[in-house]
UniProtKB/Swiss-Prot annotation:
Recorded catalytic activity of this chain's protein: a uridine in RNA = a pseudouridine in RNA
EC number: 5.4.99.-
Name of this chain's protein: RNA pseudouridine synthase 4, mitochondrial
Organism for this UniProt entry: Oryza sativa subsp. japonica (Rice)
GO biological process, one term: enzyme-directed rRNA pseudouridine synthesis
Principal EC category: isomerase
CDD domains the UniProt entry points to: PseudoU_synth_RluA_like
Cited InterPro entries: PsdUridine_synth_cat_dom_sf, PsdUridine_synth_RsuA/RluA, RluA_PseudoU_synthase
Amino acid sequence: MAALLYLRRRAAAAALAGVAPKPQWLATAARRGALVSGDDGGETGERGKSPWLQLPPFAPLDAAAAARAISRGGGEGGDGEQGATAIKWVRRCCPDLPTSLVQKLFRLRKVKKNVVTAEISSADASAEQHRLRRVSAKDQLMPGDILFLPVNLKESSVAEKTKKFDNRNEINFLRGLEIYKDEAIIVVNKPPGMPVQGGVGIKNSIDVLASMFEENSSEAPRLVHRLDRDCSGILVLGRNQLSTSMLHAIFREKTADALADGTQHVLQRKYVALVIGTPRHPKGLLSAPLAKILLQDGKSERLTIRASSNAASVQDALTEYRVIESCPQGYTWLELFPRTGRKHQRFLEPQLLGITSMDGKRIRSGCLFPCHGQLMRNCSGKGSFPLGLLWVAEASLRSNLSFIYTASKWFFLMSQWLFIGCSLQTLILISQILRSSTLLLHCRCICG
């Protein structure tokens, strides 16, 4: 009784002072919001800090339909999804959380949903009061529903990220690759030699290091497409679940529609390649059936061009090409526009033209080692980038040509070419290429 009288007096004093009393539901939610690790307390220890991590409001948008409309240049993306369960929405918004942890959160009643209730005040005015209520894994969500998770999930993920990546030079190097960033996407200039996805023997890759592009965020950017390890160029990452789903669908839509019709789509891929030889026609369309064959070791695979596309394992590859410029020494700059996104498609495109590619380890006769000129201390021997990336410089003609690298913001000066002892034939080629004003338009595209 004494406690109840105290609460009434406190509420009356707050009303006289013009300050609204603290809602009881917030204190109750804080007490129930114990840490998943087993802590007893619910308060975070900082005044005014919410004990809950708020997920984006549930939006029943069909990402595939929206991406289809965007890729075709249309308008609305069609009807949305009929609905989603609470556990499905948590997995979409927090793909980095293990499935076992998500299920544990629902079992321990750590997942809440906002509930709006209407109460009648003393002035008979309608007032909305937001409350948090436990939600089960199979509960259906309505548009606008907001789910809440314990805030310690975000804090623990940020602490783990900071502990894992504490090398400031590596972090600065990665963030220096950033070209564009907004609320939905991040665009980076992937260096050569860095794999996009991890695997056996791969320590650092874009998908592992993606969290370094975010400051104090538990949601790391997600991959939506890939580039080959030896290829440099623009790589797009999604910053949230919705943008990632739509970008995934846009890339899939492009490949599927390229085989169905000749419709011009919003998404366009472009590569710039230095090749040996000159195509017969200045532009055209390449079409070839590609297939994988298993090598004798039983583990490795090789991509080959088949005579026909009747086999089930054969995939058609389509690429448009255009000659930028050629020189009398027999080298040509090419623009390649892949319509399909087949694995290692770009390595076989020059072979279809009867020429030899000057990049890629899969073509040993023209093996190059592209490198950023800004980071080179000398022009011979070997060196290294952060994160274990290597560059190699030799005195041969082909390795000198490897320095023709049009990364954004970085160009070699002619004096550096003279310093490394390039032959006259090489300098003629370089002067012809650098004299072309069209090359400046491709300063954000990389050879290959």
